[in-house]
């Protein structure tokens, strides 16, 4: 058994962890002792991290926002204090950026995009898809880095919700330990002359789940012809996030934050509905690890049907309204 340090660059303001954040805690619990390092304030950490499985929560002096180098200072000190053999974070850009810089400081390895992590003897082994999801491989720390912590990012939806619920016991009081780090933006990255924060704009909050953590994703491509209305209606019925291919985002039909694929985000939902997307390898690499894929396309030779669990050859503007109607009938 090893000590696992879970890194949260921030915590929800309402004190309720996201499903992906709970998955990280459950994954850490499966490895051994669980500790946490977060850029959130001690007050926010005490509110959100009330699980009996967490032995210690490390924070800085007040909130530290990404991409501040003070976050990396905090992580480095937390690793030393906890003696962690593995550091886990979510497979998102802010976390990957911080862990990449930490890997340089500690001269150790970073494995991104993992879908499972476990111990094998004294080693921590990570399972991850490679080559656009065509193969699954396992990786661990090289012998040359022995004695140093392995840094890992895990994709959301990699752990079943029932396993997460069984692994965590809410209602405990977290032990908060403040660590000395460089003083926020003034003493962190800005002091190093690497990053200057010019402006912060809070994004409008959506009623939909976050794309990277959603258990259901409805995605559209060139075939939507600029009209995401039917997809949004289906997403509302399924409680899904909206995704898109690069063709759709480049056309300006939807924000680039919705892009799924090699140059966008990677998702691993329980259900992925692909509508009007041909399924080029660049797009497939971002969704191929979905548990169930439903493809809708007018072209029966579209590559997406090669990986789909269920395929519908037809016009999405005819198929999706029928899906919505049937879902409503079954609900009602």
What is the role of each PLM region?
Residues 1-332:
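N-terminal glycine-rich FAD/FM-binding segment characteristic of electron-transfer flavoproteins
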């Amino acid at each position: 058994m090893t000590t696992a340090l879970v890194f949260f660059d921030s915590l929800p303001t309402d004190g309720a962890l996201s499903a992906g954040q709970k998955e990280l805690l459950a994954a850490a619990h499966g490895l051994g002792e669980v500790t946490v390092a977060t850029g959130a304030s001690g007050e926010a950490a005490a509110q959100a991290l009330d699980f009996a499985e967490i032995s210690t929560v490390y924070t800085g002096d007040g909130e530290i926002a990404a991409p501040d180098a003070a976050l990396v200072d905090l992580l480095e000190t937390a690793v030393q204090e906890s003696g962690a053999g593995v550091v886990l974070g979510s497979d998102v850009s802010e976390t990957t950026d911080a862990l990449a810089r930490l890997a340089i400081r500690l001269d150790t390895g970073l494995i991104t995009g993992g879908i499972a992590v476990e111990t094998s003897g004294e080693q921590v082994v990570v399972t991850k898809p490679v080559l656009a999801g065509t193969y699954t491989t396992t990786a661990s720390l090289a012998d040359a880095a022995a004695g140093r912590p392995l840094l890992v990012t895990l994709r959301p939806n990699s752990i079943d919700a029932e396993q997460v619920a069984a692994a965590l016991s809410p209602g405990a009081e977290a032990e908060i330990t403040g660590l000395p780090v460089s003083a926020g933006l003034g003493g962190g990255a800005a002091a190093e002359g690497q990053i200057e924060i010019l402006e912060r704009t809070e994004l409008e909050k959506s009623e939909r789940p976050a794309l990277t953590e959603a258990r259901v994703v409805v995605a559209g491509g060139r075939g939507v012809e600029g009209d995401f209305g039917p997809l949004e209606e289906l997403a509302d019925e399924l409680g899904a996030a909206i995704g898109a291919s690069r063709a759709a985002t480049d056309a300006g039909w939807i924000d680039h934050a919705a892009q799924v694929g090699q140059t966008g985000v990677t998702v691993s939902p329980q259900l992925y509905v692909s509508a009007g997307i041909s399924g080029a390898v660049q797009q497939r690499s971002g969704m191929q690890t979905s548990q169930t894929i439903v493809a809708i396309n007018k072209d029966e030779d579209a590559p997406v049907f090669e990986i789909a669990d269920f395929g519908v050859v037809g016009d999405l503007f005819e198929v999706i309204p029928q899906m919505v109607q049937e879902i409503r009938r079954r609900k009602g």
